[in-house]
């Protein structure tokens, strides 16, 4: 079980304690950490919808430190980022790999950031299938459809040609923050707090 720090604030009505993530949510900061999976994706989607209801004009900040995970869970987050009215700024702290990199690149244009020592990794979707030959064929076709769609979206976000992204994602492709910026996955490497 992970330890989650508690912060205490003094108010005119006394003390109020929050877990650190709830306190940061008040500042419109959402953390995407660890494997991208359905439960985590649902929590992030709910937080984005809540913040949109609170103020549809103010940006939301999605901090990413993830090795990637389930494509459909990541797409739930991605679609919500594009569905809601506020811009979603993305910031990589640590790593944004696989679906984490896809979500990082899917932030609002001009508002996609990484810290100087962050690592970004892009590759094609992974999958496995077992069962009857027909079932394996169906799964393979689905993975190929997802690969084409993710490659097209990443090309759109990065400004790179589809063919280049397709070639660059054939195998794990690791980048520094500066290399991710040069590739077009992010807009700026932050060395201090200035998300403009």
From Swiss-Prot:
Cited Pfam families: CLP_protease
**Keywords from the named record:** Cytoplasm, Hydrolase, Protease, Serine protease
Gene name of this polypeptide: clpP
Job description of the protein: Cleaves peptides in various proteins in a process that requires ATP hydrolysis. Has a chymotrypsin-like activity. Plays a major role in the degradation of misfolded proteins.
Subcellular localization: Cytoplasm
- What does the record give as the reaction this protein catalyses? Hydrolysis of proteins to small peptides in the presence of ATP and magnesium. alpha-casein is the usual test substrate. In the absence of ATP, only oligopeptides shorter than five residues are hydrolyzed (such as succinyl-Leu-Tyr-|-NHMec, and Leu-Tyr-Leu-|-Tyr-Trp, in which cleavage of the -Tyr-|-Leu- and -Tyr-|-Trp bonds also occurs)
Transmembrane regions listed in the UniProt entry = none
Subunit structure comment from the entry: Fourteen ClpP subunits assemble into 2 heptameric rings which stack back to back to give a disk-like structure with a central cavity, resembling the structure of eukaryotic proteasomes.
Q: Name one GO biological process term.
A: protein quality control for misfolded or incompletely synthesized proteins
| Enzyme active site | 98 (nucleophile), 123
User: What PROSITE patterns is this protein classified in?
Assistant: CLP_PROTEASE_HIS (PS00382)
What name does the UniProt record give this protein?
ATP-dependent Clp protease proteolytic subunit
Query: Is Transport a UniProt keyword of this protein?
Result: no
**Gene Ontology CC terms:** cytoplasm; endopeptidase Clp complex
GO MF annotation list: ATP-dependent peptidase activity; ATPase binding; serine-type endopeptidase activity
Query: Which NCBIfam families does the record associate with it?
Result: clpP (TIGR00493), PRK00277.1 (NF001368), PRK12553.1 (NF009205)
Name the InterPro entries for this protein: ClpP (IPR001907), ClpP/crotonase-like_dom_sf (IPR029045), ClpP/TepA (IPR023562), ClpP_His_AS (IPR033135)
The Enzyme Commission number assigned here is 3.4.21.92
The protein's organism comes out as: Actinobacillus pleuropneumoniae serotype 5b (strain L20)
Sequence similarity: Belongs to the peptidase S14 family.
């Amino acid at each position: 079980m992970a330890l989650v720090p508690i912060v205490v604030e003094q108010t005119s009505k006394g003390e109020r304690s929050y877990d650190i993530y709830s306190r940061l949510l008040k500042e419109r900061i959402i953390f995407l950490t660890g494997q991208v999976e359905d439960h985590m994706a649902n929590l992030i989607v709910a937080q984005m919808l809540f913040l949109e209801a609170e103020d549809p004009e103010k940006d939301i900040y999605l901090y990413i430190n993830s090795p990637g995970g389930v494509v459909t869970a990541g797409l739930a987050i991605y679609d919500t980022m594009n569905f809601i009215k506020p811009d979603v700024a993305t910031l990589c702290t640590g790593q944004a790999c696989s679906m984490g990199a896809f979500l990082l690149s899917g932030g609002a244009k001009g508002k996609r950031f990484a810290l100087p020592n962050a690592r970004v990794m892009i590759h094609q979707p992974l999958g496995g299938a077992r069962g009857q030959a027909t079932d394996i064929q169906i799964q393979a076709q689905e993975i190929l459809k997802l690969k084409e769609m993710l490659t097209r979206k990443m090309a759109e976000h990065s400004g790179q040609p589809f063919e280049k992204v397709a070639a660059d994602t054939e195998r794990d492709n690791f980048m520094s923050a500066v290399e991710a910026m040069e590739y077009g996955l992010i807009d700026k490497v932050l060395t201090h707090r200035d998300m403009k």
